[in-house]
Structure formats: structure tokens, C-alpha cells
Amino acid sequence: MTKIEAAIQEYADWGSVIGVDTLEKLRNVTESGRIISLINLCEARQERKYAEIANQIYWKRDDCRIVMMSGPSSSGKTSSSLRIAQQCRVLGLTPKVIELDNYFVDREKTPRTEGGEYDFEALGAMDIAFLGEQLEALLLAQRLHH
């Protein structure tokens, strides 16, 4: 089973546990006015996941100095990174979150898709050299200038 398949199965199992494993049951929750409670429960579960990730980072802190997160544009990487960083702070760590949005090249240098749209998913859309310099500075515990 791939990691994606395992994640899908985990969420399907959790949906069964909380009694919301079909669209009909979700509609019933919504119509009965219990949607805020469900949202709060989902948020609490997600926060628990962030805490688990922070624990893994804490226990590997001597061997791992950089943690990276990947995903497509607008998938929640920055928000998740900030929440994981907060959980790391609870454990006494001092994380530095780097938002990759700050490393895009100037618009005129951004690659375009075949349809002429800006391709922010392309590696060429990022200033990789500058990002590398910043990561190296972080590893050397230097102050970042942007």
C-alpha cells in the first residue's frame, strides 16, 4: 500500500469511527446544525497530527536540521508549516519557517505553460540559487537577508 493509499484508508477508517463516512451522513450533520462540532473535531485531529510530526522532528533534532514540505500551489504547505513550527516550539525547539513564495523569480522570468499562463509549478519559477544560499546560511546559523 502506498503512503497515499494508507492516508486515504486512515481517513476512511476515521470517518467510520466518528460516524461520518458517507456524504449522506455528512449532509445529516450539516442539516442538524452539528457541522461546527464536526469542523472543530477535524481541526483537533489535524492539530494532533501536527503534534505527532513535531515529536518526530524533536526526536531526530540531532540528525536532521532541515525539514521540507512539498505539494502543489495552494495546498496548505505554509499554513501547515506554521502550525508544525508552533508545535515544535511547545517542545522547546526554535524552528525557522521559510515560505517558498518568497523565492519566486520576477514575473517576467516566470516560465509559461503551453497555454501561455504563468507556470508557478515549474522549477524555473523559483530562484533556486538564492534559496540554496539561504539554506546554507541557515545551516551555518547566519541571519537571513531577503
Enumerate the language-model features and the residues they cover.
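Hydrophobic anchor at the beta1->P-loop junction of P-loop NTPases
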Residues: 67-69
